Amino acid sequence: MKKGSAVIKTLRVILSALALCVATSSAHAADTKKVDVLLVGGGIMSSTLGVWLHELQPDWSMTMVERLDGVALESSNGWNNAGTGHSALAELNYTPEKADGKIDISKAIEINESFQISRQFWAWQVKQGVLKNPHSFINSTPHMSFVWGDDNVRFLKKRYEALQASPLFRGMQYSEDYDQIKQWVPLMMEGRDPKQKVAATWTPIGTDVNFGEITRQFVGYLKTQPNFTLSLSSEVREISRNADGTWHVSWVKLHSDEPAQSVDAKFVFIGAGGGALHLLQASGVPEAKDYGAFPVGGSFLVTENPEVVKQHLAKAYGKASVGSPPMSVPHLDTRIIDGKKIILFGPFATFSTKFLKNGSYFDLLKSTNTHNVAPMMRVGVDEFPLVQYLAGQLMLSDDDRFNALKEYFPNAKKEDWRLWQAGQRVQIIKRDPVKGGVLKLGTEIVASQDGSIAGLLGASPGASTAAPIMLNLMKKVFKDKVATPEWQQKIRQIVPSYGTKLNDSPAKVVEEWTYTSDVLQLSPPPKIDVNTPSQATGTAPARPAKASADMAL
């Protein structure tokens, strides 16, 4: 009998403890702040999604959590990227030469179409007062391709001729004339051997973009809204699924003794740049198991000498050396950062195991697990030229980098230039049923099956296409909402070309160029023949050329 009483007593203690735990848990759940949307990361992607959602569903509550002491301090920061408004006007890796010698322009059309969506999105935000003074974040900067040598000149001419099939590229000019090119970029031609065979394309509709400034203005606007909260110096430590399908996310305030904070969010977006993969893995969603990552950094030579800077107004892209990946493509770039004009040359690849410039040296190790280690090793074998290139880059001396600059700027003086370490770019490695693992280009949206959590992986073309990338994300995770007449009407108001292919209509191209150039205070667009229909389909080729890694700086 005594034994039975002891068992009952023990059982009561256990049940009481369980009841206390349940009560505590219920009280905790009741006290935890509830939000419709949690944005992890304070960069261009999260801020763009925040503005999109505020436009489409202004009654939704949002919280943004950023690990650093301010927004736009990582990859979106103007000093951590080249600020190119990527539209395939100059970047030769978007137009590979196929085995039959023809130039494939399908990727170039896709990239350009995407950037036109970004231009329209920014123009709308200027009209609404969300973005102030367009010159603070976007400026007309001609985009050009510049090559030398018979084979490269031949390639560039074929590229130019192929692109003329699309109205998106008909504002482009081509020249092999020394004097003409000197008019476009005097700094690049002075001191050059006049007998050297060179060629260039020149497109005046190109832009330089300060993505950090766009981010700061977007977040500055969101902070004025009553249902938006920003938490800085906040590092996410836990992401777990609640029984009701929402996500419980906890973070700690760095440099502070404040207790951990948390929210229960109906939807979580992880826009943490290089930190996104680790957080997706921490969430436990099976979709994250398909991915691994490899970090590549970039450095630039920088000059702020006004006598040098005033001689160059262009983003001039070259061609990668034979056997080198596209990330080795150097470019001599005009930049306008916080109102000051400078010139960057690079990038030169660097390596660190960090996934973020302000990350941890353990990032690569922490992201590697039993699910992705085999695909990562497979890519290391298949992409050996990339490994060789990185090894070679790490061995470059200051003289090597300066000699590379002199190929573009023959009269460069060493004392005018300094080396700047830019941001980290994390290349996506995805499990492949046939190859084991493949290196993925571009950005990739990784979302749970129910659409309650999503993250963005990858780099190229990155911030330039934040608006269309976030639009595609919303189509994936808010499919039913996007299909409603209310959202459809609003999206078309923000992006007039939504649902159409500008490539198919020269008249629409001119209309969009004119509208966005006017609102964004850019140079008037070039005149093109609207009566000549597009001869480019923009569809992917049946036998695409082998893709290579792209650092997208």
From Swiss-Prot:
Its cofactor is FAD. It catalyses: (S)-malate + a quinone = a quinol + oxaloacetate. Its EC number is 1.1.5.4. Pfam families: Mqo (PF06039). Disulfide bonds: none annotated. One of its GO terms (molecular function) is L-malate dehydrogenase (quinone) activity. Keywords: FAD, Flavoprotein, Oxidoreductase, Tricarboxylic acid cycle. GO terms for biological process: tricarboxylic acid cycle. It is an enzyme of class 1 (oxidoreductase). Pathway: Carbohydrate metabolism; tricarboxylic acid cycle; oxaloacetate from (S)-malate (quinone route): step 1/1. SUPFAM superfamilies: FAD/NAD(P)-binding domain. The keyword Nucleotidyltransferase does not apply. The keyword Oxidoreductase applies. Residues 524-553 are annotated as: Disordered. InterPro entries: FAD/NAD-bd_sf, MQO. NCBIfam families: mal_quin_oxido, PRK05257.1-1, PRK05257.1-4, PRK05257.2-1, PRK05257.3-2, PRK13339.1. Belongs to the MQO family. This is Probable malate:quinone oxidoreductase.
